Amino acid sequence: MSNDSSLGLMQIGLATADQIRGWSYGEVKKPETINYRTLKPEKDGLFCEKIFGPTRDWECYCGKYKRVRYKGIICERCGVEVTRAKVRRERMGHIELAAPVTHIWYFKGVPSRLGYLLDLAPKDLEKVIYFAAYMITSVDEQARHDDLPNLQAAIDREKKQLEDTRDADINAIARDLENDLARVEEEGGKAAEKRKLRDSADRQMANVRKRADREIDYLEKVWDRFKNLKVNDLEGDEALYRQMVDRYGMYFEGSMGAESIKKRLETFDLAAEAEALRETIATGKGQRKTRALKRLKVVNAFLTTDNSPLGMVLDAVPVIPPELRPMVQLDGGRFATSDLNDLYRRVINRNNRLKRLLDLGAPEIIVNNEKRMLQEAVDSLFDNGRRGRPVTGPGNRALKSLSDMLKGKQGRFRQNLLGKRVDYSGRSVIVVGPQLKLHQCGLPKQMALELFKPFVMKRLVDLNHAQNIKSAKRMVERYRPQVWDVLEEVITEHPVLLNRAPTLHRLGIQAFEPQLVEGKAIQLHPLVCGAFNADFDGDQMAVHLPLSPEAQAEARVLMLSSNNILKPSDGKPIALPSQDMIIGLYHLTTVREGWAGEGNTYSSVAEAIMANDSGELHLNAKCKIRLEDFVPYAGWEAPEGWEPGQPAVVETTLGRVLFNETLPEDYPWDENVADKKHLSALVNDLAERYPMTRVAKTLDNLKDAGFHWASRSGVTVAISDIATPPEKPAIMEGYEAQAARIQGQYDKGLIDDDERRSELIDIWSKATDEVAQAMRDNLEPTNTINRMVSSGARGNWMQVRQIAGIRGLVANPKGEIMPRPIKSSYREGLSVLEYFIATHGARKGLADTALRTANSGYLTRRLVDVSQDVIVRESDCQTVRGLTLPLSDITDTGVRTLSEDVENTVHGRVLASAVADENGEVLAEAGADMSDAMIEKLYAAGVDQVRVRSVLTCESAVGVCAACYGRSLATNQLVDIGEAVGIVAAQSIGEPGTQLTMRTFHTGGVASSDGDITQGLPRIQELFEARTPKGVAPISEVAGRIRIEDTDKSLKIVVVPDNGDEEFAYPVLRRAKLLVADGDHVDVGQQLVTGAVDPKEVLRIRGPREAQKHLVDEVQGVYRSQGVGIHDKHVEVIVRQMLRRVTIIESGDTSLLPGELVDNVRFLEANRGAVAEGKRPAAGRPELMGITKASLATDSWLSAASFQETTRVLTQAAMEGKSDPLLGLKENVIIGKLIPAGTGLDRYNSVDVEPTEEAKAQMFTDPSAFADFSYAEENAGGLGSEFQAIPLDDYDFGGN
């Protein structure tokens, strides 16, 4: 990765023919590739060494010059420069075209840029380019105007002449007829014969008239066409055009093909066109105005940049370097070649044939056909299949063109620039390593040796085990004994990165210190499985090796697993004891009545352990034990005279004493049963109180204790543990009677089918719940299944209910709940019919999961793309704005409680304004951090809501500021400058995506209030894409009174505004559930019926702030309904990006165009500038964009092109001559620079390291420490390998 900060911009533009020739090292004239006998490139062909460079390093084509000493010489015999062969990856050639061709991206893209510029419909443009119509490129209006009377007179003369000729011909026919009639009369002919003669004469006359009229009409048509001829007119009638050219060729010019487009562009006045369009926009309406706006964008793009519209027509085509379109020999002597070579060959063949035809002076029709074929060949080279049928190769496969090389997952952007593969990596199956510490992983010896090979070889040479690197390599390959000792030494404190695919969030890659293990499997610490979502059923993981000292320091400080205990999405611990460990700790901390040793008192823990060993005291029996270093817990009643720090006699169990020994010494005594919930709260509390190293140590202790006691808990499962409740038959009987009654009412026609279904579902749901409760009551506390589920180690009550109680209601393939339940449990066994209906749900579940994974992955990708440039750029933007969030809720019974979502709304933020109690005493200043303690304090003081900073109100010009973001949830500290909070937000929202359901829940086919409520993942996508939901619920546009109009045909809600304006009527479906009644008063933006609201309507009626709130609340509603906790700030980051743009309505005196989408910051800047100069500011409307659209609308063309619609983005960017400011992450990854986030920021890189006094003293006293150290260039990267990574927290880098 280069860290060249001089590269500040990346510009794209239209290449002119001269630029293409400037890039080129020579013209490719022949379609040949390589000689079939010598296998060497053909001269002037597509692989020519003279143009592209030698195929062998330092060797010319003919072999006259070999070796590096001739570097730079151009061989006089073969013309090849003696240089490295790798120049064949860089040097371009070109094809000089015999006729210009248009660039298909600008003509065929949507919208057609050429069409907009020339004001031609794409259909007409196509006719011109592909030689189906002539285009008038210039008209000499003045000359035509001057000569019009003469030309009119000439036409009139010609018409008169035609009329005279017609009349003369008719008279001649009439004379002949008279003569013939007279002759027939003389001969005594019959009347029939005369009639025949007359008819024949009439026919002749009619033909003469018709022919003459046709000629006169044609003449008039030619004249009218010429008289009204203007530039840009098309003429598809070849004969008519020829006639015009013959008669009036000196007054106009016209042509076909790309040449006519080129001529037109050469004379095109951009400034005049822009002025005319602005005029149209100011005065026009409707369709005309819209089209003028769109055209102005294109015209303006050429006016305001150095781009020339002529760049859209090509006179030369660049030929990319041969190594990028290689030709390789296969085993059978055949060749595999890149499709581009075929496409280039077609272009060269057609171009050469066209040159030959032009030299021969071939007829125009043949030349035009060849030009059309050349145009098509260049089209298919640039974008095969964009127009007409694609060019296919063998097996009818469409060939991959230059556009296809960039597009899609396999394209250049996503495959090579954003998805590079790395060396120093390996992968293997994972197995559990319960003996490891949290920061360790077990690395198989062979794998470690391969990964650390260069380090081992260097060390072998340093220790004189080998004379040189070559012999060291041989030693490593032969697994000599010394190698293993050196390997042990080399891997000490050199972290490795472990990664498990799919990497859904940043905890999917973590650093560990490797421990060498036998076998071929990587050993993974059991507590990090949650973060990786790993299990040991055959999962594989990849290992990567950070090489440079900087990379190692980053891995150790930022990525070490013991520093990543908290989840970035909600700040909860993710390294939690699970399964076996929970069972062990639960077993350890439960209390049992009547066990051995109950009520005894012991003088010390040691004595109690001894009693346990001898069988006198059971682990779970209540007893009194004298404890040293006892830290009391809340609610412990201290005996009289007891002082903190003194020993205390505590009533507890030996198990709980052992459990507390795993916790830090100064942690309050824990007298609770250690189930999953309690352990989570415990680790959460530890993370709040102690540094991460201490928490990691405690977690390891808990893990060891958990495994140890799990193996002694005797948890097994037997069929006898699955006890069906004896009350089940009686319960079922009662509910069956109710169901029969409902069925009877239906049979009699008292209720309809929907009511029957809903009643039955209700009845059987109650029955299921009652059986489940009976089953739970029936289970003994010692029952192992009960212990497993109660402790949270495995399974849930629903699963137990299905095994031991009742299977209950299931869904059919449509997703509707069937009103017939499965009455058996798995323990009792299902009947055939029950088994059959149960299979539907199971199959749908599996299909669902597969779909969900793909959809969730795509959602994450779009979220990352839209938010990747949201980086913390400054410590405080000094804004006074913020959000008001509730601290407390009032329950249904009227009791005030702490808001249940406070952890994911207020926690971890910064106060925007000071908080005072009722007496006006300030409890917290603005800028205070909302920690758990602070929230408790404010709640206790009776504060019900607080104003906090939020990224939604942040005023940083680029990225966001640390104060508006608040705490980084992963570290529990205020977020660092440089933190990529956008990507963290995207990962936090995308990672639980797979847990969300795909279905739209059906309430058993019952017509619910608003059809089927879209839930789960589809709802999240609908919100983030800002789509109008299906069956949208209306919201009131004004404040007023409700009047409900219920007619036979429809149901309408009418709002009568308070201010007496026109009424608003909202037609609603009959089955919709109304939220308002007749006569109610509604406020602006109040929802009128249940259902999903259109966020665009919320924005229009209630404004951006309410739209943001609505989106955040709706997204959180979906996640909370699934029991997934995500902090609001992550959703806010995404919503901020969706509402970042403004559509310009009035441009005022600014440079902004009406209808243009601009960034809020740019809009405000332009307006400030205009107001400062006393000009009119622009007016704009905030725009809510879906995440896909917002990603494509980013200022960075590199980022947008690598996301979706690559060709469209590049076409637009090149036309506008866009510059990419390289502020986001993707752009910098693409061009190979360090990302401007985290440790890639300049402030962390421009640091001078100076040795301290101690280090200097060490240098003089112990030369060995700095044996390899020099201030020479090669060691500028950092100190030698003996030095450990230094925690970056100890340094003050200035600025925060």
Swiss-Prot record:
The RNAP catalytic core consists of 2 alpha, 1 beta, 1 beta' and 1 omega subunit. When a sigma factor is associated with the core the holoenzyme is formed, which can initiate transcription. Its EC number is 2.7.7.6. Keywords: DNA-directed RNA polymerase, Magnesium, Metal-binding, Nucleotidyltransferase, Transcription, Transferase, Zinc. One of its GO terms (molecular function) is zinc ion binding. GO terms for biological process: DNA-templated transcription. Its cofactor is Mg(2+); Zn(2+). The gene is rpoC. Zn(2+) 1 binds at residues 60, 62, 75, 78. DNA-dependent RNA polymerase catalyzes the transcription of DNA into RNA using the four ribonucleoside triphosphates as substrates. Residues 185-202 have a biased composition (Basic and acidic residues). Gene3D superfamilies: 1.10.132.30, 1.10.150.390, 1.10.1790.20, 1.10.40.90, 2.40.40.20, 2.40.50.100, RNA polymerase II, clamp domain, RNA polymerase Rpb1, domain 3. Binds 1 Mg(2+) ion per subunit. This is DNA-directed RNA polymerase subunit beta'. Belongs to the RNA polymerase beta' chain family. SMART domains: RPOLA_N. InterPro entries: DNA-dir_RpoC_beta_prime, DNA-dir_RpoC_beta_prime_bact, RNA_pol_asu, RNA_pol_N, RNA_pol_Rpb1_1, RNA_pol_Rpb1_3, RNA_pol_Rpb1_3_sf, RNA_pol_Rpb1_4. The keyword Magnesium applies. It is an enzyme of class 2 (transferase). Mg(2+) binds at residues 535, 537, 539.
